[in-house]
Amino acid sequence: MSKLKGPDGRAGDRLPNGMPAVSWERRWTEGALPLWLVATAGGTAVIFVLGIFFYGSYTGIGNAG
């Protein structure tokens, strides 16, 4: 077992010399797509769908006029 691993088997955040174990560039882009990009696309999609519902409430079958 490596000295760098914690009791739960995961690697620590810092090396023994105090340097970060993972560079900040890789820490935010480890997955296939960066999380900020997925969150931005998801948030935009939610706002778009809500906009469609609000538009539909003012026009079409559900309008008061």
Curated annotation (Swiss-Prot):
Q: InterPro entries, alphabetically?
A: PSII_PsbJ, PSII_PsbJ_sf
**SUPFAM superfamilies named among the record's database cross-references:** Photosystem II reaction center protein J, PsbJ
Q: Which GO terms describe its cellular component?
A: photosystem II reaction center; plasma membrane-derived thylakoid membrane
Biological process per Gene Ontology, one example term? photosynthesis
Residue ranges crossing the lipid bilayer per the database entry: 35-55
Q: Where in the cell is it found?
A: Cellular thylakoid membrane
Q: What is its main location?
A: membrane
Q: Which Pfam families match?
A: PsbJ
The way it spans or sits in the membrane comes to:
Single-pass membrane protein
The alphabetical list of record keywords is: Membrane, Photosynthesis, Photosystem II, Reaction center, Thylakoid, Transmembrane, Transmembrane helix
* Biological role stated in the UniProt entry: One of the components of the core complex of photosystem II (PSII). PSII is a light-driven water:plastoquinone oxidoreductase that uses light energy to abstract electrons from H(2)O, generating O(2) and a proton gradient subsequently used for ATP formation. It consists of a core antenna complex that captures photons, and an electron transfer chain that converts photonic excitation into a charge separation.
What's the family? Belongs to the PsbJ family.
Subunit structure as annotated in this protein's UniProt entry: PSII is composed of 1 copy each of membrane proteins PsbA, PsbB, PsbC, PsbD, PsbE, PsbF, PsbH, PsbI, PsbJ, PsbK, PsbL, PsbM, PsbT, PsbX, PsbY, Psb30/Ycf12, peripheral proteins PsbO, CyanoQ (PsbQ), PsbU, PsbV and a large number of cofactors. It forms dimeric complexes.
What is this protein's record name? Photosystem II reaction center protein J
* Native species: Prochlorococcus marinus (strain NATL2A)
Gene field: psbJ
